[in-house]
Amino acid sequence: MKVTKSEIVISAVKPEQYPDGGLPEIALAGRSNVGKSSFINSLINRKNLARTSSKPGKTQTLNFYIINDELHFVDVPGYGFAKVSKSEREAWGRMIETYMTTREELKACVQIVDLRHAPSAEDVNMYEFLKYYGIPVIVIATKADKIPKGKWDKHLKVVKQTLDMDPEDELILFSSETKKGKDEAWGAIKKMISR
């Protein structure tokens, strides 16, 4: 997909702040520091629309980005970061759950995992949550450039097994450095929004 327009619309914490207009939405979820912002920026060919941070757990709101006036990307707060208070974590959990379970415009969730490591307990919980609520999911295994090509299949197998992935769900190898998987990711997203 050729992106000619991409900008942040709103950072929301409650449903009344979500944008109107009925555009399809793709949520992006992943552990803090998994490379979510880099994934968004490389998909839309922008250096810093989604702010990348060396401080994990920085996104504490649902950030809605409009893409080509056709769809919204919704950047969800990173999960699994220890330096955040329990009450903050619970508040984020409620905010994410409310959005994911009630938003009619939500077409799918892109769950981003780090190819270098087996998915964490939080990754597994997130995947199970999405499956439980019947939210279509695309799993992106990022940071592929950090692993020798010959080991990709082995690492992808670990991701599939740890998440106990539904064979119907797409698993895409991705690198924001080399742009590997960018076309496949857009292809999967387009399929979801046209359903």
Swiss-Prot record:
- One Pfam family named in its UniProt record: MMR_HSR1
| Keywords noted in UniProt | Cell cycle, Cell division, GTP-binding, Magnesium, Metal-binding, Nucleotide-binding, Septation
* Domain EngB-type G as annotated: residue spans: 22-195
GO CC terms in record:
cytosol
- Annotated binding of GTP, by residue: 30-37, 57-61, 75-78, 142-145, 174-176
UniProt record, GO biological process: division septum assembly
**Cofactor(s) needed by this chain:** Mg(2+)
Q: Identify the residues that bind Mg(2+).
A: S37, T59
The reply to whether GTP-binding figures as a keyword in the UniProt entry is yes
Please tell me whether the keyword Magnesium is annotated for this protein. Answer: yes
Any one Gene Ontology MF annotation carried by this entry is:
metal ion binding
Supply the InterPro entries for this chain.
Answer: G_ENGB_dom, GTP-bd, GTP-bd_ribosome_bio_YsxC, P-loop_NTPase
Record function comment = Necessary for normal cell division and for the maintenance of normal septation.
To which protein family does this belong? Belongs to the TRAFAC class TrmE-Era-EngA-EngB-Septin-like GTPase superfamily. EngB GTPase family.
HAMAP family on file: GTPase_EngB
Q: What is this protein called?
A: Probable GTP-binding protein EngB
Gene (name only):
engB
